[in-house]
Amino acid sequence: MTLRSLILEMRSRPHRVVHDLAAAAAADSTSVSSQDYRWSEIPEELLREILIRVEAADGGGWPSRRSVVACAGVCRGWRLLMNETVVVPEISSKLTFPISLKQPGPRDSLVQCFIKRNRITQSYHLYLGLTNSLTDDGKFLLAACKLKHTTCTDYIISLRSDDMSRRSQAYVGKVRSNFLGTKFTVFDGNLLPSTGAAKLRKSRSYNPAKVSAKVPLGSYPVAHITYELNVLGSRGPRKMQCLMDTIPTSTMEPQGVASEPSEFPLLGTRSTLSRSQSKPLRSSSSHLKETPLVLSNKTPRWHEQLRCWCLNFHGRVTVASVKNFQLVAAGASCGSGTGMSPERQSERIILQFGKVGKDMFTMDYGYPISAFQAFAICLSSFETRIACE
């Protein structure tokens, strides 16, 4: 999110919440300086102009850490607000830095996003919804482009809509389908095996600036998506299953913890790892020795009056489409130690995707998957399935 939207959204909270923040700030010191008071009570119009200039200095995209620290140093009230924004999305529900796109979403809510499709350029843009309206401009998060090959199709995912090169630092991963469009593999272009990364960083001769750009980038499988045969063709609901290779079932337990990367690796670091080094990725982590999490789509019900298959998207989907789906933890992934009954666990939506316009779709996701993983799964829904439809 932009600094402007973060601060203005927090300042627009109910008066009681703002008062609590002020009281907490006052508790840090017996007296609050007049300068702190002036900054905390600055008119919203003037605050907006200041933040616009700060965003312009950052290039209009993601806020730099320098800008976040500078805002935190303005006064105690701003420091408390900034403390909330830099917490991981699992707790704050905020996407403050690019690495937030690779971190799990919130546990108790869903991050509301939407996808815009361009049929001419075969591109897809993911935006973060800044309001409850389905028509807002949103904050750009990720972009993807479709590349057709003889035996497969690739969806290249990037941090920039104007740079889809796999050799770019903006490259974050890809989705590859088989010829029939029934099986997909999600590759993470920024995931480093712990052993290989440690050796590179400890090496005295390692210099990222001197690494040849011709060395192929490493991509590591993090999820497998499967669409099953639909006997009703395009008239019936799709049946899909997602095997999350890097997310163990224990993350669904009350005290479960999902892995949270803290930064993107340097391009040079990523380039020097060969594809063969990605094979021991699963065994290199104690987390991945457990059974991986399996997500399956929630079965829709047939509505006799409307004569269509229905799911409750709580107003987030307005157009009936075979692409619409909701993902929940599969029964085998719930486990007996989750502290939650299988019936209740099956009602917890982890990812939902649906159509709201000709080329507009909503995407809402939550813990334990990230925005990148959710976007990759949704991209698979756009592919034509020769064997299923």
From Swiss-Prot:
Transmembrane segments: none annotated. GO terms for cellular component: plasma membrane. GO terms for biological process: regulation of DNA-templated transcription. This is Tubby-like F-box protein 11. It comes from Arabidopsis thaliana. Belongs to the TUB family. Residues 36-82 form the F-box domain. Residues 250-289 are annotated as: Disordered. The gene is TULP11. InterPro entries: F-box-like_dom_sf (IPR036047), Tubby-like_C (IPR025659), Tubby_C (IPR000007), Tubby_C_CS (IPR018066).
